[in-house]
């Protein structure tokens, strides 16, 4: 599904409750988690609660990208003045971001409520590890490809906006030889 936007058209979440239920509906059908206790009175139903978790996951994912060395290199900024990623500038691979958000919601918020951490072979503990691994794989893939962010905000991702890296030429001296690294 496409990103969730507010009335102004700004992205507020990469996924919604239907995306989460589509991937892991057994947890909800088997009623393994008493969500009436988990959801605060501020939410009218389970879908609103899950939508709120999806919004939290987007914030955490954007922060993880911002904290990566990839973002520092991509923006050319130092650690003290890093700009935030703008979710409205993500123009490609939106389904990958939706999947990554669902994996994050499941591994961090929903499955830990049902998991029995005392039993290592617990199905829910195994699922947490599974979704955690899938999340990390997708995160690393998005960093490696880096063809999804519209840096200049013109509505398209052009070749010049894709990740470029620069290496400084330096000399390294060993005992018997000199190596030039580019």
Regions found by a protein language model. Name each.
Residues 52-148:
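Internal mixed-charge
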